Amino acid sequence: MLEADLVSKMLRAVLQSHKNGIALPRLQGEYRSLTGDWIPFKQLGYPTLEAYLRSVPAVVRIETSRSGEITCYAMACTETARIAQLVARQRSSKRKTGRQVNCQMRVKKTMPFFLEGKPKATLRQPGFSSDFSVSKKPNPTLLRDKGNSLGVKSDAEMPPYTLHTTLRSEVFKDVPVQRHVTMSTNNRVIPMCSHPDVDPLQYVGSVFKKHKYLRFSPKASLPPPFQMHLSRTCAKEMNGNLSQTVEKPNVTPPASYTYKMDEVQNRIKEILNKHNNGIWISKLPHFYKELYKEELNQGILQQFEHWPHICTVEKPGSGGQDLLLYPAKRKQLLRSELDGEKVPPSPLPAPKQIPPLKGCPAVMPGDFKEKVAELLTKYSSGLWASALPKAFEDMYKMKFPEDALKNLASLSDVCTIDYISGNPQKAILYAKLPLPTDKILKDAGQAHGDYDIKSMIEQEYLQIEENIAKSVDTFLENTAVPPLIIPTEASPSVLVVELSNTNEVVIRYVGKDYSAAQELMEDEMKEYYSKNPKVTPVQTVHVGQLLAVNAEEDAWLRAQIISTEENRIKVCYVDYGFSENIEKSKAYKLNPKFCSLSFQATKCKLAGLEVLSDDPDLVKVVESLTCGKIFAVEILEKADIPLVVLYDTSGDDDVNINATCLKAICDKSLEAHLQIDAMYTNVRVTNICSDGTLYCQVPCKGLNKLNDLLHKIEDYFHCKHMTSEYFVSLPFCGKVCLFHCKGKWLRVEITNVHSSRALDVQFLDSGTVTSVKVSELREIPPRFLQEIIVIPPQAIKCCLADLPQSIGMWTPDAVLWLRDSVLNCSDCSIKVTKVDETRGIAHIYLFTPKNFPDPHRSINRQITNADLWKHQKDVFLSAISSGTSSPNSKSGSTPVPGSTGDNFRKSLTDAIKKSVVDHTSSLSVEELPPPVHLSKPGEHMDVYVPVACHPGYFVIQPWQEIHKLEVLMEEMILYYSVSEERHVAVEKDQVYAAKVENKWHRVLLKGILTNGLVSVYELDYGKHELVNIRKVQPLAAVFRKLPFQAVTAQLAGVKCNQWSEEASMVFRNHVEKKPLVALVQTVIENANPWDRKVVVYLVDTSLPDTDIWIHDFMSEYLVELSKVN
């Protein structure tokens, strides 16, 4: 299969597993989480990811929201629909990043093997006690009221207005087991609104306002429709469980239980309404927790078949145990009004039917309907149609017409018929109650007998509406909009709206619970205000008032009044952050139901720019680079105005926006502007990289000013006692601070933060990169801060011009010769031949003092000596020569910062110092660490999976040792950043230290390539990497004590000789980079620790009430995949 076709196929599978689409900034991450690779759009010939996506309209559909967010959706394809459905069942859209997991495994319904005991409680989630026993299977028929067990807040935590805004027409509609639930206040019955045009929210809200002292009493009754449903549910459960006594039939639930059940049902309806195409019941707890930040009681999952008004349950034909849930079908039915009496539920037909009475007189059609109407008045809860013949014969001692039940529609003029599940043969009959005075008016000969329940409710609704209109202003004033919660994810996305200074940048968070929820709310606002003719503009306004504003393009937005004039008001759009003057006629009262979503516009502070926050040039640069664009954000401090760093992730590399803006406002007059064909003397070469790139300092105004400021800072620190305020407490990438090296303070920029102790820095004025401890950095004193950060970096990146093309890659000998010749020589000279602005590099001829200005004796000509370019095998160059001056250099020259700095070397511990005694001669006899401890077969252990290829090959790490590994990695970074590189002949299958992606790892050398690269295996993480041979160093003895952490593993319980790409992708997504519990089946020992192997069962215990056995899941997946194939 061609790569383009394979990428399209994988992309479609990823998109089909997200029915609501994937935002463009998250698409690469979602694709990689499932496939292990990035989308190779550049290899396919496209400059950007978006360009590639638009080139495959048959695979992806792109939509742009009003906020500017681009969302990708899958196009329909029957070929992969089944696989995508399986992926959707198992994937988690929000990866767990915390290290705390729950290792308490629950009892499984079916076990493929005999299991005794329970796992250790070492990965307990917060809130679980360590002695927590194996939980029991939840009761499927009864949910008890125990505090917060239903996954909703307790009554005491609810704000006073929650009761008004969350209740719907299903109030107390479903309470299993109990027959009667009542509401009363001062013995007054509150009618429930059943008019089809009445908004249930407004109706219930108005009722609660009328009866503010309302309490739920266990001594009243629900309306007949609710009684009917409870009776039917109760009877169905009792008939199926006659041998089990659950509760006394007439005992009502506590009010808090009923209220919680109602809120849970409303929440489930909201979730289902967002998934019109159905949702697997196994995924519902995940969506519930993600949306409401609460756990859903597993017992509720057993109740859905008894909640037809909440959802429709469907069992797929695939034979699986999972069920599909759909939104409930809506019915427009007229319900009768509640009477104040407690009426027993309608009798169900007895198991043994009594035959019709013989010899009973025939019933005439007219008399029959009157008798049916009279009979139904005795059953205010309704009567099943199947029970009507017996009740009729028992009451009137007459024969029931045989064809009457076959044509129930003929009775519609004397009763209300409620068909169940659309079945015309299954219905409940209700009496049509006339007005209380109907009989008197009829006897008086007046023709007013056409009043029914509908007209009564209409009159009451008009009355209620007037009361609501009067109290809505007061209610709105008292309604508090919840504060905006900062996202918990590591790097959320934000849309930058506007800014007046860098300390108050207006942003909006992008995501499902933020921008997507806002768009949904605005659509509801448009629906409400456009189609409600009774909504009128506000008449009186005041500063601070919340409004709904009819903005441009017929959009309805939330706004707050800033100031008022005669016919115009100035408002701030609270979800967008900008202000506007509008006419008062466009402002309407904001309905309370639109106050539940937090104001989406918020402010942030850009880290590192605080001292220049009001600088007009800086504000202009930040505005041009950020406004109207979406960025990933690193939140450094969570506060009312959080401190953040913005990153542009649209290109190949992440761009630090804060650092880019800071460099853009540097004083251009202080730069060294190189002119082509110009000659410069007294040039200092400050750094030489392994690829031949040089960094030079050219005398200029900026360099002189920098040296003066650094000298003043040295005097300042010498005279002033060093206090904790000058220590760097919050390091972040792009921060500029000071580092002391060789008796001088130098400017450094943090380029990478490894941990709370170690980080990488680049010396701005020499180009050197090294790793240092956080404790060795210092803040720039405030009095010098603004002056020193506007000075541009004084290190100019250069390369030697006109080198022969045959030279190719620089050899260690060539780099070493160049360092010995010119490094730290302060009086070199250069001639500029070319300035490459795009790459930021100057092409130069370099001269030592005695050879200037003869071009034939330049460094460019001398370095072409053929002996320097012989590619010797396995030769390492020594960095110690970087501190050695050339014969022509002055004795007082400053050495390269960070390469051999005494102060930095002293910061290493004595233990590390003593461990580096002549590794070159003793490398072959170095001892290996002991093998890592593994549990015995049949025992559990807590593991982390850093790498997973397929169920037949993955890598595990013991969870309890991970913190020791992190400490060791920090020490290796600090040690190898300052230790000299050693000459050593690398050998295959030997252990070394290698630098991989800015971190040092313990590796096993697997092979030596001819292009200067070596293949290594990370002994602690299980990854195979290719690194430059120069980045391989001897492994110090102090780093050989901790056992190698990576152990190769195989999944037990599944048999498959060849794993497909799709199956491997599913397995990798489910276990890679996750903490799990492993049940050891077999340990295969070996003399080499990296050749040990273990066969384990894996269990995902991250869910509170369900354990996911990976082998069961993969077995089910293989069965489903075989059906597709």
From Swiss-Prot:
Stretch list, region Interaction with CABLES1: 920-1125
Region annotation (Interaction with CDK17) ranges: 888-1125
Family matches, as InterPro entries: LOTUS-like, OST-HTH/LOTUS_dom, SNase_OB-fold_sf, TDRD7_LOTUS_3, Tudor, Tudor_domain_containing, Tudor_TDRD7_rpt2, Tudor_TDRD7_rpt3
CDD domains: LOTUS_1_TDRD7, LOTUS_2_TDRD7, LOTUS_3_TDRD7, Tudor_TDRD7_rpt1, Tudor_TDRD7_rpt2, Tudor_TDRD7_rpt3
Domain (Tudor): residue spans on this chain: 540-597, 730-787
Gene3D superfamilies named in the record: 2.30.30.140, 2.40.50.90, LOTUS domain-like (3.30.420.610)
Residues annotated with Phosphoserine modification: 346, 886
GO BP terms: lens fiber cell differentiation; lens morphogenesis in camera-type eye; P granule organization; piRNA processing; post-transcriptional regulation of gene expression; spermatogenesis
Ranges of compositional bias, category Low complexity: 881-895
Keyword Phosphoprotein: yes
All copies of domain HTH OST-type, residue ranges: 3-76, 260-329, 364-433
Localization annotation: Cytoplasm
Keywords: Cytoplasm, Differentiation, Phosphoprotein, Repeat, RNA-binding, Spermatogenesis
Skewed-composition ranges (Polar residues): 127-138
Function: Component of specific cytoplasmic RNA granules involved in post-transcriptional regulation of specific genes: probably acts by binding to specific mRNAs and regulating their translation. Required for lens transparency during lens development, by regulating translation of genes such as CRYBB3 and HSPB1 in the developing lens. Also required during spermatogenesis.
Record's subunit section: Found in a mRNP complex, at least composed of TDRD1, TDRD6, TDRD7 and DDX4. Found in a complex containing CABLES1, CDK16 and CDK17. Interacts with CABLES1, CDK17 and PIWIL1.
Name of the protein in its database record: Tudor domain-containing protein 7
Organism of provenance: Canis lupus familiaris (Dog)
